[in-house]
């Protein structure tokens, strides 16, 4: 699989960056639609995005580097090279949400109103972004038989044939799951006015899918013998259930 999309002079533009940019652009278009559903300010959303996006990129990189520091110890300058991947979504979510919380608190705007609107866009970006992993030949699962992989389209078979072995296209599993979540979240955004429900549903549903898919991957980040993504996913599921229960319980009081 060729990771290079095209060249600008001597500069190679990788598919990874092109796909991340595409996911971001489509996420912003979806947010415009979702802001109308909730009657939220799209201008305020863009201001929030301009703070959240770089914060998320920094967080995603730092999170990855912390757990893979041995790969960078002897060449620290490579920490700043993200063109070949090395972004951990959990770090991006944590840093991005924290930046948004601080910004909206400063602006005296409702945190949950805007993260509810953002949730479908975030998961859409993740669904599209996983295809960047495909072109980088990363984030795949363990070895599979030719008979198993033959059930997938030919281009998936070709991309998952790495150094003489076929691998689970886990990027595809997560991408499909994320697209399903995106559709559900847009539906939920239309159906409920309870602030926080949509965002916490995003956290819970993404965590649920990621927990199972992570078990198939061969490139997981570890904390001792524990897959970090699975640990964070369990915490995400618990957190979402706790918040959704309390949001609904609070609404019933009034």
UniProtKB/Swiss-Prot annotation:
Sites where the protein binds a 1,2-diacyl-sn-glycero-3-phospho-(1'-sn-glycerol): 130
GO BP annotation list: lipoprotein biosynthetic process
Disulfide bonds: none
Record's bilayer topology term: Multi-pass membrane protein
EC number assigned by the record: 2.5.1.145
Presence of keyword Membrane: yes
Subcellular location: Cell membrane
Xref: Pfam families: LGT (PF01790)
Pathway linked to the protein: Protein modification; lipoprotein biosynthesis (diacylglyceryl transfer)
GO MF entries: phosphatidylglycerol-prolipoprotein diacylglyceryl transferase activity
Alphabetized NCBIfam families for the sequence: lgt
Protein family membership: Belongs to the Lgt family.
PANTHER family (UniProt xref): PHOSPHATIDYLGLYCEROL--PROLIPOPROTEIN DIACYLGLYCERYL TRANSFERASE, PROLIPOPROTEIN DIACYLGLYCERYL TRANSFERASE
Name of the protein in its database record: Phosphatidylglycerol--prolipoprotein diacylglyceryl transferase
């Amino acid at each position: 699989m060729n990771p290079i999309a095209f060249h600008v002079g001597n500069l190679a533009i990788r598919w990874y960056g092109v796909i991340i940019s595409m996911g971001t652009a489509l996420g912003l278009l979806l947010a415009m639609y979702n802001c109308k559903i909730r009657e939220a300010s799209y201008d305020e959303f863009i201001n929030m995005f301009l703070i959240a996006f770089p914060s998320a990129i920094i967080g995603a990189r730092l999170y990855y580097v912390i757990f893979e520091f041995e790969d960078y110890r002897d060449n620290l300058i490579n920490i700043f090279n993200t063109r070949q991947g090395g972004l951990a979504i959990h770090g991006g979510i944590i840093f991005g949400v924290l930046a948004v919380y601080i910004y909206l608190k400063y602006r005296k705007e409702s945190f949950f109103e805007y993260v509810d609107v953002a949730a479908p866009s975030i998961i859409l970006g993740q669904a599209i972004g996983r295809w960047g992993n495909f072109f980088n030949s990363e984030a795949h699962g363990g070895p599979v038989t030719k008979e198993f992989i033959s059930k997938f389209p030919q281009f998936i078979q070709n991309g998952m044939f790495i150094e003489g072995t076929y691998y689970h296209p886990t990027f595809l599993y997560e991408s499909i799951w994320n697209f399903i979540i995106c559709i559900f979240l847009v539906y939920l955004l239309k159906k409920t006015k309870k602030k926080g429900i949509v965002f916490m549903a995003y956290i819970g549903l993404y965590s649920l899918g990621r927990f199972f898919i992570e078990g198939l991957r061969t490139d997981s980040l570890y904390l001792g013998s524990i897959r970090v993504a699975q640990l964070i996913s369990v915490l995400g599921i618990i957190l979402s259930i706790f918040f959704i229960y309390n949001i609904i319980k609070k609404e019933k009081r009034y």
